[in-house]
């Protein structure tokens, strides 16, 4: 019981998780800066080498290797070991593969490898150079997980594997992404740094200008590469290698022969084909994966008139034909994860190789000295051969003979052992010469090794020679092309859109769609698909290259390119704005819709219930970044109850504002200033406390009408409302009643020509040709009335007009609109 300690759970959890984090950082996901290997990779290579599963021998079942690795060094499950082994065999993920594998080891399409019982593996030839001299006490060893066997903590690494094959992994609080590089270039940089320990980054980059991905491609951004080599972090653009191929009949196709590193080819082909299926860019006929054993090839066949460069730019921008590669060069350096630059990686590798060469030389020197000692004894024996033979013959046994040799002739234990085990044929004159030559060779070797151990310059010459030997044997050309500047992809979106005629429809409730002329002409206007409680407010023929602007009662504007509208039948309801616009409110309604060809010029005027008015420029409505998911403001409302009453393009005429209490004010539209989208505007009319604006319209005719909520209608002359200035109260156009007073429901201009453009949100709906402007009124009981406005007689300003029916006063007006 004395060993039991009381500790808080908080302290225990923190301390234990700290241990766990340290373990997975050092022992799982991050590579060592010296050999560039994670522990599982190192264990795989060491175990296969220890078992003799090397490149000069036959392949061995992967399952056997995995079992040995798991049983002796890595008790974390066979899947993780096999996955790591397979990855080291994939030539599209490693610049130099470390494991050779027979059988299905996966593919660039993301296909899984065959089970380990079906595949065979062995170390590659270059992997042997990572393990070279490991038997010569060159690296430290540690006990394995069950203290039954020792394993190396690092490999000798005769080439800089961390840079050559790169690394990627995620640990607790750390992640690493080190790109692969060309073996020749890396070795050239190491050799230069050996000769120039304080070499500048710029000079090193003359030898190692950038990554070299096994999948090739084009790497753009020299400044970012330099930043990454300096700080350990950076980002470059990796672009596919493409070419435009001419076909018969004037057609073209885009051929992709190299894709960015770590991009799944099958997913890439699917994404490109999705662009074709969804017609995001017109002109693509077919997408084919024509890859075979000779290499990668993706063919994107185009229509005859398609703009191949524009389509290619679109695919580069919106698919993984072009990606960003983010450098995050983190490695374990002296048991600590560090973000390292190129100079640190190279200097750490050189320091590691220095230790390896010195320890190897010490081992070889000790071995040579031991052998020299034996050879010296054997040569001495040959000079007194008869005496030695006589002594051995007179001895009782081997041990007695050894003791007699040591006592009588002062031989050492090792020399005595060699003498008594000497075979008789070795006593020929030929063997004497051989021993003398061996003695000379051993003395020369010891001198050389002593120089390596004692003289740093000699040691570095050995290091450079060995690196150059690796380069000579395994060098291959660079696969990735380097370009200094990242090219900005510019897409002429207009050229991507096929120009087609279509009909656009919008309802007050926010449903919109586009319909082909064929579907539109096959139906009548009344057959439009809509909800029973909704109202069609806009139908217009347009082109798919044009733009739709929707202005709402809450002061928001929604932008939609017409080609992005859902193409539906005329009888379909359409897509509701709430499906895409996240800030579209439940009570929000569409007030006005407009189709524009460009945003170069044009003004709009907006009038709110609170009597404020503003003009704003169409240029400010050019597409914003988040237009697909959010609307933007075109006017700021004064309070939550305020609403926009009227919005329309500005014409150079007077404006006439009519309030619910019957006040009318007329002033020039030029009095209204042009303001930004976020402003609330200026006061258009001076309202009483209990009043609000009912209607606003441009004066384009000699008369206008006023409809009250009780169904009373009158027509009066515009001149009865003289032009004045904005922000005044205006004149009454209704006579005040003590009981059941009239309130303005709708007011607007009376046109002599029904096709004339009117400052009213309903005029865009196409109707059958008529010479009369009609007012449609629907009562709260559902009764519909139609009145030809031009047939109304002019009334006095102070009159309340006439009821449109005998019963309308009791029913009251629900909806009113002109057409």
From Swiss-Prot:
Q: Does the keyword Membrane apply?
A: yes
| CDD domains to which the protein is assigned, alphabetical | TOP4c
Sites annotated Transition state stabilizer? 117
On whether Isomerase is a keyword of this UniProt record, the answer is yes
The protein's location, in the record's own words, is: Cell membrane
Q: So what EC number does this one have? A: 5.6.2.2
Reactions accelerated catalytically? ATP-dependent breakage, passage and rejoining of double-stranded DNA
Q: Where is this site: Interaction with DNA?
A: 38, 74, 76, 87, 93
Topology of this chain in the membrane:
Peripheral membrane protein
GO cellular component terms, semicolon-separated? chromosome; cytoplasm; DNA topoisomerase type II (double strand cut, ATP-hydrolyzing) complex; extrinsic component of plasma membrane
PROSITE patterns named among the record's database cross-references = TOPO_IIA
GO-annotated molecular function? ATP binding; DNA binding; DNA negative supercoiling activity
- The active-site annotation reads 118
Q: Which domain of life is it from?
A: Bacteria
Q: Which UniProt keywords apply?
A: Cell membrane, DNA-binding, Isomerase, Membrane, Topoisomerase
Broad EC category = isomerase
* GO terms for biological process, alphabetical: chromosome segregation; DNA topological change
Start and end residues of each Topo IIA-type catalytic domain: 30-496
Its assembly, as annotated, is:
Heterotetramer composed of ParC and ParE.
Functionally, this protein is described as follows: Topoisomerase IV is essential for chromosome segregation. It relaxes supercoiled DNA. Performs the decatenation events required during the replication of a circular DNA molecule.
PANTHER family associated with the record: DNA GYRASE/TOPOISOMERASE SUBUNIT A, DNA TOPOISOMERASE 4 SUBUNIT A
Q: Which family does it belong to?
A: Belongs to the type II topoisomerase GyrA/ParC subunit family. ParC type 2 subfamily.
Protein's UniProt name:
DNA topoisomerase 4 subunit A
